[in-house]
Swiss-Prot record:
InterPro entries membership: G_ENGB_dom (IPR030393), GTP-bd (IPR006073), GTP-bd_ribosome_bio_YsxC (IPR019987), P-loop_NTPase (IPR027417), Small_GTP-bd (IPR005225)
Protein keywords: Cell cycle, Cell division, GTP-binding, Magnesium, Metal-binding, Nucleotide-binding, Septation
SUPFAM superfamilies to which the protein is assigned, alphabetical: P-loop containing nucleoside triphosphate hydrolases (SSF52540)
Family according to the record: Belongs to the TRAFAC class TrmE-Era-EngA-EngB-Septin-like GTPase superfamily. EngB GTPase family.
GO biological process, one term: cell division
UniProt binding sites for GTP: 16-23, 41-45, 60-63, 140-143, 175-177
An example molecular function term from Gene Ontology annotations: metal ion binding
Protein name per the record: Probable GTP-binding protein EngB
Record function comment: Necessary for normal cell division and for the maintenance of normal septation.
Residues noted as binding Mg(2+) in the record, renumbered to the chain: S23, T43
All copies of domain EngB-type G, residue ranges: 8-195
Reported cofactor(s): Mg(2+)
One Pfam family linked to the record: MMR_HSR1
Amino acid sequence: MFESRPDRDAEVVLIGRSNVGKSTLMREITGHTFDTGQRPGVTRSPNHFDWASADFVISDLPGFGFMKGVPEDVREEIKTDVVQYVERNAEHILVGILVVDGKSVIDIIDRHSGPDEIPHDVEMFHFLREVGVEPVVAVNKMDKVDDKDARLNELCDRLGLHPPWQQWQETIAPISAKHGSTEPLNEAVRHHLHEVQRDDLFQFF
């Protein structure tokens, strides 16, 4: 269980599988470099970044899902910790940024879809909605995707959102964190902050 959360009223969280670029995105949003492990699963506790002048924190939660060299029971424990963290702090979390790898997300979802299996990304998207946290899917590494519209439409379909993706721009945000191309995500987050009358937090996005 994660115990390190700063005492801040408002929060935005980054959630996602290992190796989807969460740490790069966190650095892009905050301008701050975090100590991240070279191997997936090394980061087992959240990275929090808060500003002294604002009652606000951004949290990068540990990556879940398959991690090479990490036992399955440890992977499940990390995922459980992430879920419990969100449940425990849901009333403070204004937006849940679900980061996925635009290049591989469809293959991963399809590989793990079956009668007895729900893909982690799909499960986490609906979980955020169930606990009252607005999800924004940051579809990262889109600079590596050729047919962007087709890929984003497929992702909408897998998440139960009726394509075309352009009608879901408050929920689906194609980005490339490595290249600093995050404006669609910033706009989506600002939309949800405005909905809860927190325009004062626009300065961070």
